[in-house]
């Protein structure tokens, strides 16, 4: 599984945790994440760990590229939750988030990817 971690700051602990779930690419700019998806195909999950307007900009860049890539936004500002719904973010969490919560949230996103990629009965 391929996971993108989008954050301006280094997230060593979170990166190490996500690496247990798949290959992690870290981006400090939403545009670079989109460029990587254009070049290499969509990620199985994208995790935005940036607060407020910066996090919203990451999400807008990613949603501008694809409405289908599973997207988790973690922010310290709960008031951005309505914007996350409007942008069709799959899951929005307010910090602090424990390692267990992060692992579970990303695992659920990856399960959505698996279900989306499974052939439907009518396709067979």
Describe the residue ranges of each PLM region:
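Two-component/phosphorelay signaling modules centered on CheY-like receiver
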Residues: 3-35
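Conserved phosphotransfer microenvironments
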Residues: 11, 30-34, 39-66, 77-78
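Alpha4-beta5-alpha5 "output face"
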Residues: 63, 82-86
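C-terminal output helix
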Residues: 97-106
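The C-terminal output helix
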Residues: 107-121
